[in-house]
Amino acid sequence: CNINNLIFKLMKYVSKNKFLVLFSTLLLTALVLGSFVKKGDEVEVIMTTSKGELILKLYNQTPIHRDNFLKLINNQFYNGISFHRVIKNFMAQAGDPNSRDPEYTGSLGNNSEGETLPAEIYPSLFHKKGALAAARMGDQVNPEKRSSGSQFYIVQGKKYNRNQLTQMEARINQQLEGNLVGIFLKDSSNREYMNRVKVCQQNGWMDSLNVVIGEIKNMVLKDVDKFTFSEEQLKAYETVGGTPFLDNGYTVFGEVVSGIDIIDSICTSPTLPGDKPK
C-alpha cells in the first residue's frame, strides 16, 4: 500500500471574510506570492496523501521558508514525492527527490532540491503536534542550523509531564553551550584557545581542560539567554504532545490546521529498515 505520494493544492482564507480561493493541484501563481500574502493573512495548502488530506498553514513569521515551500509547490517539485521516513510518536519526513522512484534502493534523506535556507527559529514557533518544520544536517557540519532546500517533517510526537520537560530544558541548554563552544574554537582568531584545549587533551589534564572550557563559556554565554519552555509550550506538550527536544534546533514554519489524524495514521504505518513506510 503506497501511503506516501504527496499532492499539494493552495488555499487562501482572507481574514474575517472567510473567502476561499482554491487553486488547481500544485499550481501556485506569482499573484499569490505577491498580492495575496498580506500582513495578518496566512497561506494554507492542502496536502493530499493516500491516507487522506491535511491542511497546512504557513507562518508569515518565517517568510524565507514559506516562500521556498510555495515555490516548490508552484514548480510541481512535490509531485510524486513520498514520505521516506516515518517514526511512531515522532514525525513523518518527506522532500527527498529520489523518493519519487519506487525502484530506488539507496538511502533516502540525503538529497534535497535547491540551496539550504538560513534558519528562522523563534521561541513562539515550536514543535507541538502537527508542527511543520524543515529538516537539516546536524550541528557538527551545520552549526548555523541551515535548513534543507526541500525536506520537511510533520510532528506527531507524544505527551510529556512537567518533570520530563524540566529535564529536557537542561539537556537543550547543554547542547546549546556545546555548540557555542564548538563555533568559538573553530574560529581561527581563537587559535590560542584551541591550542590550549589540544594540549590538555593530549596530556590528560582534565582539570586544566575544564578551566579552559569554563573561560570560553564565560565569553560565549555572557549575552545568551538560557533556553526555557514558555507556559504555552508546557501546556501544549502536556496536553496535545509534540517533540520538545527539537525546539531551538530546527525551523518550524507552519502547522496542521485540519487532518491531524492523517499524521497519526502515517506515523503508525508499518515500516521497512530505515523507517521507510511499506
Predicted regions and their residues:
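Cyclophilin-like peptidyl-prolyl cis-trans isomerases
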Residues: Y13-S15, L31-K278
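Bacterial Sec-dependent N-terminal signal peptides
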Residues: C1-D41
